Amino acid sequence: MSANELTSGDFTESGEPFKLFAEWLKEAEVSEPNDPNAVALATVDEDGLPNVRMVLLKGFDDDGFVFYTNFESQKGREILGQKKAAMCFHWKSLRRQVRLRGPVEIVTDAEADAYFKTRARGSRIGAWASRQSRPLESRFALEKAVAEYTARYAIGEIPRPAHWSGFRIRPTSIEFWKDQKFRLHDRVEFRRPSPEGEWDKVRMYP
């Protein structure tokens, strides 16, 4: 199924960015071969040097876009330090892209606990065993840590580590991009002065 067959209406006429994103993500779930919720997450360190990596979007609504991670990882430390981040979704099958950026907040403990319980048991063990973004002596050292935590939590529920939780990006800018012939692409950006502000829509030159 082509992008044109999936598209209904002119997205540049939309005035609701979260609703438009939901529609595009739903279409990506049909056309993408795997992980339609994969997104490039950009952060910056204390020197202003950027870092980018792929993560998985685990939820979104009018409050923002949520993902989960180890707060002691590089991205965790950078977000806690700068309290800002950016994301870029790129769906090749649809020839579409969505970029967003804004301040970041930590999700509630209740949200983090609820999501953590949905993860595979092995993934919950991994959250304890992996000292993410730190030097690893060998694969054996990681597997040993996994075995130790597997034994520790052999019975009962596996608690969520205090250093593992979620972030919510509350965008002040969301841009929708769609490929067109001769690189004359369609671009629409929604902007607001703060996460509580009203959206303004601007059509952009490609």
UniProtKB/Swiss-Prot annotation:
Question: Which EC number applies?
Answer: 1.4.3.5
What residues bind substrate, as annotated?
58, 115, 119, 123, 183-185
Q: Name the coiled-coil region(s).
A: none
Binding-site positions, FMN:
53-58, 68-69, 75, 97, 132-133, 177, 187
Q: Which UniProt keywords apply?
A: Flavoprotein, FMN, Oxidoreductase, Pyridoxine biosynthesis
GO BP annotation list:
pyridoxine biosynthetic process
The note on the cofactor says: Binds 1 FMN per subunit.
> Which pathway is recorded for this entry?
Cofactor metabolism; pyridoxal 5'-phosphate salvage; pyridoxal 5'-phosphate from pyridoxamine 5'-phosphate: step 1/1; Cofactor metabolism; pyridoxal 5'-phosphate salvage; pyridoxal 5'-phosphate from pyridoxine 5'-phosphate: step 1/1
Question: One GO MF term, please?
Answer: FMN binding
Keyword Endoplasmic reticulum among UniProt keywords: no
* Family (UniProt): Belongs to the pyridoxamine 5'-phosphate oxidase family.
Oligomeric and partner information: Homodimer.
This protein's name: Pyridoxine/pyridoxamine 5'-phosphate oxidase
